[in-house]
């Protein structure tokens, strides 16, 4: 496998657009990365267009696909036990509507055990714009079992409308807390590969329709929050 090594960010830093243009403008300040990103410290991306370009594996996908096949999960930001903040970030790759689903993944773990895992992964997705979207969010790791708590504060869209509170194929042991804002579109939580409590808070003035609360240990509604439960869902 010749996957690119991740871009390692090893100091507390804010990477922010400085032109004053909106992240959704065609000529917005932007960062294009053709590799995963891994945190080694607390990092904020703010007022910027962040394009994580999916890796193309040459020869994959059969003879008919001579250009190869995409490996979309290569476009992942790994929090690695640090605080990741995405503040008013446009995640769209390119300008073609066919690329609308080419969005970054987020993991609370590390890239193939690279770097050092911190004590707690905190993922903040705040002040969304119309192009603040993510392919999927995994609290856990892709390649290793982890013992770590994870906090996810989500106020944006996720393409599959769910949060994975474990790893992709490995176990996460630890508590996961999730806060859903009024711009989030989460309907369920997948606790596969997760051992620990799942506590969910719906932010004030937020409305959640058809929420499946199966697997949730504690559900909190802030002021003026409203939730309509999916039929048959059951709070533990």
Enumerate the language-model features and the residues they cover:
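Short glycine/acidic-rich loop motifs that flank beta-strands on beta-rich extracellular proteins
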Residues: 25-27, 53-61, 73-74, 92-105, ...
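Right-handed parallel beta-helix/beta-solenoid
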Residues: 38-42, 78-83, 108-118, 138-147, ...
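Acidic glycine-/aspartate-rich tracts in secreted/extracellular proteins
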Residues: 19-22
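All-beta strand scaffolds that present successive hydrophobic residues in beta-strands
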Residues: 14-17, 39, 43-47, 58, ...
């Amino acid at each position: 496998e010749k996957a690119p090594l991740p871009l390692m960010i090893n100091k507390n830093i804010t990477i922010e657009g400085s032109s004053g243009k909106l992240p959704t403008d065609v000529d917005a300040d932007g960062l294009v990365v053709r590799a995963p990103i891994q945190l080694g410290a607390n990092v904020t991306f703010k007022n910027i267009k962040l394009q994580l370009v999916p890796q193309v594996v040459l020869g994959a996908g059969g003879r008919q696909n001579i250009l190869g096949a995409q490996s979309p999960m290569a476009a992942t930001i790994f929090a690695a036990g640090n605080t990741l903040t995405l503040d008013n970030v446009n995640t769209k790759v390119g300008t073609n509507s066919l690329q609308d689903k080419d969005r970054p993944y987020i993991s609370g773990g590390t890239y193939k055990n690279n770097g050092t895992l911190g004590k707690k992964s905190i993922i903040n997705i705040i002040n969304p714009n119309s192009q603040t979207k993510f392919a999927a969010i995994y609290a856990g790791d892709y390649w290793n079992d982890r013992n770590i708590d994870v906090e996810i504060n989500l106020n944006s869209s996720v393409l599959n409308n769910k949060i994975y509170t474990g790893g992709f194929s490995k176990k996460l042991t630890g508590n996961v807390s999730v806060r859903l804002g009024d711009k989030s579109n989460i309907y369920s939580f997948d606790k596969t590969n997760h051992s620990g409590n799942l506590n969910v808070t719906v932010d004030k003035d937020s409305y959640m329709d058809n929420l499946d609360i199966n697997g949730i240990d504690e559900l909190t509604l802030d002021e003026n929050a409203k939730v309509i439960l999916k039929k048959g869902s059951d709070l533990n």
